[in-house]
């Protein structure tokens, strides 16, 4: 799960890495270690994961500075502790149940919504975006003099999780308090509040994603990851002019999916 690994690794001793060292640095070994820890809650540092979640809102740069520290101490950028993923999953489940309650869904409808949000919105879309960003960053953003390094898929997925968490809290938690009495009232104030929350949430996703890739010293021109802000702001302005309520569309889609 290393985001940067040297293709031409320095030799050790007689010029060949020991089998133990080679295994330790393979993506497969790291993936196995990560998945094994996923079922050992006592080995997870939930306090540190909660700290990261807090700073993703207040100072996301500090989160990625910790990624630098991990690279220096453990020779990997990506998380080796699944505590963040576990807490994110809990947030996702609780907020989705709240969404079902606010939309007056029944028990089985809420379960269907939960399965859809977890396996499609989070896992499916997350795998797609992570793979796309992994391909783009390796294909176009690696510096010419750093061709021996590449962005590993595991780090791309970590960046997605970092960016997804603020979006989740804004759209699946904070927004719940405004849906029935403000956002879905078919008034200008309604879609102004709703669409502004979408603007902030998606904007946060773009910004945290940019910070994640700009933290890698072997990448160049990462500022292009901020370019989606332009169409986002344009879409926001058009939605207000046309009276298009993003949250109303989302709620209608959710209700359609659980029928």
Curated annotation (Swiss-Prot):
Keyword terms, alphabetized: Acetylation, Golgi apparatus, Membrane, Nucleus, Phosphoprotein, RNA-binding, Transmembrane, Transmembrane helix
This protein's encoding gene: UNC50
Family of the protein in this entry: Belongs to the unc-50 family.
Originating species: Bos taurus
Residue ranges, annotated region (Disordered): 1-22
Positions of post-translational N-acetylmethionine modification: 1
Any Pfam family the entry gives: UNC-50
Record-listed Phosphoserine modification sites: 6
Primary location: nucleus
Name the record gives this protein: Protein unc-50 homolog
Role of this protein: Involved in the cell surface expression of neuronal nicotinic receptors. Binds RNA.
Biased composition regions of type Polar residues, renumbered to the chain: 1-17
Cross-referenced PANTHER family: PROTEIN UNC-50 HOMOLOG
Metal-binding keyword on record: no
Molecular-function annotations in GO: RNA binding
Entry's transmembrane regions: 83-103, 116-136, 164-184, 188-208, 223-243
Residue ranges that the UniProt entry lists as topological domain Cytoplasmic: 1-82, 137-163, 209-222
Topology with respect to the bilayer: Multi-pass membrane protein
GO CC terms in record: Golgi membrane; nuclear inner membrane
Places the protein is found: Nucleus inner membrane; Golgi apparatus membrane
Family matches, as InterPro entries: UNC-50
Gene Ontology terms describing biological process: protein localization to cell surface
Ranges facing Lumenal side: 104-115, 185-187, 244-259
């Amino acid at each position: 799960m290393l985001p940067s690994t040297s293709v031409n690794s320095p030799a050790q001793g007689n010029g060949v890495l020991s089998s133990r060292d080679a295994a330790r640095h393979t993506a497969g070994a790291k993936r196995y270690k990560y998945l094994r820890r996923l079922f050992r809650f006592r080995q997870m540092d939930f306090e540190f994961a909660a700290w990261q979640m807090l700073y993703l809102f207040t100072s996301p740069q500090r989160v990625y500075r910790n990624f630098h520290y991990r690279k220096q101490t453990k020779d990997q950028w990506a998380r080796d502790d699944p505590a963040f993923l576990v807490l994110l999953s809990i947030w996702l489940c609780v907020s989705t149940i709240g969404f079902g309650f606010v939309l007056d869904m029944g028990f089985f409808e809420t379960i269907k919504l939960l399965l859809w949000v977890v396996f499609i919105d989070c896992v499916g879309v997350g795998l797609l975006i992570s793979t796309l960003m992994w391909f783009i960053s390796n294909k176009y953003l690696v510096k010419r003099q750093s061709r021996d390094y590449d962005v590993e898929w595991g780090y791309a997925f970590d960046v997605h999780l970092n960016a997804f968490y603020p979006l989740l809290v804004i759209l699946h938690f904070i927004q719940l308090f405004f849906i029935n009495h403000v956002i879905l009232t078919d008034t200008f104030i309604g879609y102004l509040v709703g669409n502004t929350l979408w603007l902030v949430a998606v904007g946060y996703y773009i910004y945290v994603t940019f910070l994640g890739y700009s933290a890698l010293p072997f990448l160049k021109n990462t500022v292009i990851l901020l370019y989606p802000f332009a169409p986002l702001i344009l879409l926001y302005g058009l939605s207000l002019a046309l009276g298009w309520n993003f949250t109303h569309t989302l709620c209608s889609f959710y209700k359609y999916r659980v029928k």
